[in-house]
Amino acid sequence: MNFELETLDLNGAAKEKCDALIVLLATSFKPGKDNLSILVAQALKAGDLESQSGKALVLYRPTGLACARAVLANVGEGSANEVSKAVKAAVLAVKAGNVKKLVICFAALPQEAPLRAAVTAAAEASYVFTTTKSKPEGRVIQRVVVAVSNSSGFKPVFDRAVAAVTGIEFAKEWANRPANHATPALLAGAARSLAKLANIKCEVLGPKQVERLGMGAFMAVAQGSEEPLRFIVLRYDGAQKSAAPTVLLGKGITFDSGGISIKPAADMDEMKFDMSGAASVLGVFLALAQLKPAINVIGLIPSCENLLDGRSVKPGDVVTSMSGQTIEILNTDAEGRLVLCDALTYAERFKPRAVVDIATLTGACVIALGGVRSGLFSADDQLAAALVSAGESSLDLCWRLPLDDDYAEGLKTSFADVANVAGRAGGAITAAKFLQRFAGKFPWAHLDIAGTAWKSGTAKGATGRPVALLLEYLLTSAK
């Protein structure tokens, strides 16, 4: 899908030939004398256009307009969130038709955030996954024109939004793939493909190299699968070599059965989404290649499957992590923290300015925050504030949760330096406390995306989160 930015007022939008014209109307809108304004005024007077934000009215072949369909969408006060809801509703109202060219017109000049929201919402509402379908019905909308009365100064923010969409959809593509279409080796292939782009390099380590590094925790998770593990290292070099990089660490469990601590059968298919953290890292790197910001970023992806086998790690086994700390594995379904802890130790060699890990880590985080906000954990107030701000700006929200030392009491064990689980209470926090033990040499944050990485039910599928949050954080830090 191609996005374009054009300067069009309402009069110009009325003359634009397209399959659908979406007009975004704030409550402050004052109709003029052009054909489109007259149409809006008539709809308001008749009560056909609801005053509630996010509501849309579809008109077919409206008189005086060049479009095949006009959609009048209420954006309330015009905030980014209201624009996002309105655009999604409008696109959903027309996408079943043969809409190839779509024009989204702001009736009044927007702020930057609502314009970005319109781009990302149009992409989300029209997204279709087709990779594993024999006769796919692909995305109908091919061209989206975003129209404002004066586009001067909007090009940088527009390009940023389009790059974010590109990254989000790349993350969705890989997270949505079934596990047999997204093995660790195939995921590594996707990372290697990114190395063809500007400023990106990729290195992939296999089992022997990981063993030499002493990543005993990562290897313990992988040993129950016939699919060999991969440790993916991506580099985006946009600044001088002397500039300390930010490290993004994505959990890459391409399928999680739970191991011997096996998961219930219901919804186990959704465990293909357990590599959504890794997918988000890939998406961010694709967006970085498009935008070329002056920063350095490292992407780390420990990838493997967590399956049952005669060689699978057993509850009670003790393994030695790359840091030298020993871990008693009391629950083999708490495997994400095991692959992440070795990757956190590996991150030390880059002397990073910050490390952010992204993982579908705990069901406890889903219980705490649902599917609205990702869980954020960090002992660094500045880093936490920057990530929260990035989430607010990008509408990819997170919520900071505590990391009090008392929460780590449950991780104590008589048989190793630390256990991989505590009790049920505060499970998202105790998981973060486990990771914190391996992140003492750099500013660190943990994003638990177990509730936000995908949707279940009739809308089942990856969301591409938190690509937008991470990209916003990186671009802001580059200023």
Swiss-Prot record:
Quote the protein name from its UniProt record. Probable cytosol aminopeptidase
Q: Reaction catalysed?
A: Release of an N-terminal amino acid, Xaa-|-Yaa-, in which Xaa is preferably Leu, but may be other amino acids including Pro although not Arg or Lys, and Yaa may be Pro. Amino acid amides and methyl esters are also readily hydrolyzed, but rates on arylamides are exceedingly low; Release of an N-terminal amino acid, preferentially leucine, but not glutamic or aspartic acids
Catalytic residues in the record: K263, R337
According to the UniProt entry, its GO molecular function terms are: manganese ion binding; metalloaminopeptidase activity
One of the protein's GO biological processes: proteolysis
Tell me which Pfam families the record gives.
Peptidase_M17, Peptidase_M17_N
Q: Sorted alphabetically, which keywords does the UniProt record give?
A: Aminopeptidase, Cytoplasm, Hydrolase, Manganese, Metal-binding, Protease
* Cofactor binding summary note: Binds 2 manganese ions per subunit.
Needed cofactors: Mn(2+)
Q: What does this protein do?
A: Presumably involved in the processing and regular turnover of intracellular proteins. Catalyzes the removal of unsubstituted N-terminal amino acids from various peptides.
Binding residues for Mn(2+) 2, per the UniProt record? K251, D256, D274, E335
Q: Name one GO cellular component term.
A: cytoplasm
Which family does the record assign?
Answer: Belongs to the peptidase M17 family.
EC annotation from Swiss-Prot or TrEMBL: 3.4.11.1, 3.4.11.10
